[in-house]
Amino acid sequence: MSEAYKNAGVDIEAGYEAVKRMKKHVERTKRLGVMGSLGGFGGMFDLSELSYQKPVLISGTDGVGTKLKLAFSMDKHDTIGVDAVAMCVNDVLAQGAEPLFFLDYLAVGKADPVKIEQIVQGVAEGCEQSGSALVGGETAEMPGLYTADEYDIAGFSVGVAEKDEIVTGEKIEEGHLLIGLSSSGLHSNGFSLVRKVLLDDAELDLDTTYEPFERPLGEELLEPTRIYVKPVLAAVKSGKIDGMAHVTGGGFIENIPRMLPEGLSAEIDHGSWPIPPIFSFLQEYGKLKEEDMFNVFNMGIGFVLAVKEEHLTDVIGTLESHGEKAYLIGRVKKGEGVTFGGAALS
């Protein structure tokens, strides 16, 4: 071990120990197609082992944003990896792709093997939920760039779809119906506003349980992002899904139009799904306007699917049989953007 490097703030031995601790978590994510083992210079995946005829690879990358600041404050790191996976796999899912493998990038101020293991444990959990193999990653110790207690995490997902079964949204027409899948809470967006409203302005305590919650505020805020892969793929296989949107940063206003062809808009039936209490809690403390809420947060709907009216019952049945809470939340009309009960929010 280099004492000079350690004196500069980089502990190579701690890094080795972290990798050793990761291995059991990586191992449980293995799936058909994975080649090699942890420690190579690149992760390998044999696409020919799968039954795709005209495979198209679909990739996505994302991070967790300032939700990490709450993990630091709570010293709770075992769910943030789920968020990193969810943000990526739900994106590739929106085009009908089956996630195949995942890589993570973890930058830390100080290599703490126990903390790193907790983070990677969450990544592995997210990979299991999505059917992804964790085939590689990078853990970089960066003293001077991050404090000893800080880190950042990003993820990279690669999925596959048959070329003629990719869901692009181009088949969506006026009259299509919109199905919303319930979120688990805030997911991984809007946390700069969350922290300003609840921590900076209201000075609430993360370890205190406030009405109407049954657990400390910090745990409520750190609830991991829901992963929609398995139920949605089951619905996609029916061939009845014409468009999908992952409701992330920008909320309904920015994300639903991304799946719509030009000249079409989404009319949302406000009140057609239950909005989790964390959102009214935030709105009350921050005195936030409704348009702010729908522009920033998922408001209880984390994923949206567009289907023809004649397919609605079948698709909802498939989703619910896989444990999803699915709601008819609106329809596609001529126009632009998103309206709520006929009133535009901007």
Swiss-Prot record:
Any GO BP: purine nucleotide biosynthetic process
Known pathway: Purine metabolism; IMP biosynthesis via de novo pathway; 5-amino-1-(5-phospho-D-ribosyl)imidazole from N(2)-formyl-N(1)-(5-phospho-D-ribosyl)glycinamide: step 2/2
Catalysis performed (reactions): 2-formamido-N(1)-(5-O-phospho-beta-D-ribosyl)acetamidine + ATP = 5-amino-1-(5-phospho-beta-D-ribosyl)imidazole + ADP + phosphate + H(+)
Gene Ontology molecular functions: ATP binding; phosphoribosylamine-glycine ligase activity; phosphoribosylformylglycinamidine cyclo-ligase activity
UniProt entry tagged with the keyword Cell division: no
Localisation per UniProt entry: Cytoplasm
Name of protein: Phosphoribosylformylglycinamidine cyclo-ligase
Organism whose genome encodes this protein: Bacillus subtilis (strain 168)
Gene: purM
